[in-house]
Amino acid sequence: MAVSALMATLCWSATVATGFGALDTAKIESGTGLKGTWTEAEGVFKVTQPRNDVPVSVDGWTMPPFMGLTSWAAFSVGGTSEVMISGDLVLFEDEVNPVMSAALDAGLSVTALHNHFFFDQPRVYFMHLGGEGTLDKMAAGVKAALVRQKAVRAAQPQPGRVFGAGFAPAKNAVTGALVDDILGTKGQPNNGMFKIVIGREVKMPCGCMMTKEMGVNTWAAFAGTDDNAVVDGDFAVIEDELQPVLKSLRGSGINIVAIHHHMTHEQPRMLFLHYWGRGGVEPLTRSLKAALDVQKAVPPPSHDHAKA
């Protein structure tokens, strides 16, 4: 019994030794504000927070958090930094972009944004996080994201159903020349709307090139009027471009609505982030131009066939 008690104490001590170093689990809990569990076989300490503040139903059935509505962050000893983390935050639509900004500002990476269910009420999204750095910084980043999420719900207990920027005009009258002049593109008008497409290329396992017309592209579509417009679109980014482009778009107030992949086995690996913005055509276009400039400044990998 004495030996068992000693082993339990060692396994659950504030600083847990692993084959790769040590994790101060007490500091993780205090830094994130969450309680966690230690998985000795993997050298991972995981903190969790069930989303039980707002009831969620899927296909008419009330979902308990155990069935996939729990935010979490897992910490392990890093390779080149003190710790590495991964995580998944359960968010409602009006929480996504404020929380994303908080995570990015705190030094975390946002690696995916998508849904896990159909017919969920209210709609739930999942934001995947990653990062390497000091334990203090990574834990503080997780806490900052969760504090921001709670602030959104404190201000409005029930999840919002619109972005809140009002409605764009029913009749479209976008001056496409404004967009082309800023982006250096030649876009396509359509019934007062305007769309630009910027192609990229990836190589597939067959040795074939997948190109702009096959879906490897960045695009932006504008509707409304020059003073009151909506822009939606998609940025095609290689992995190293994702975080800089996200930071640029969020810094300009553009909403990110999805981050995922469209293909498998392509080279270089291409990710797609979908966005939605409101405002005047000129400031919206300048926001996109800033993100494109940030993207172009990222050095390409040696095997990059992409052309922005």
Where do the protein language model's features map onto the residues?
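Long, contiguous binding/interaction regions
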Residues: F20-R123, G130-M270, W276-A308
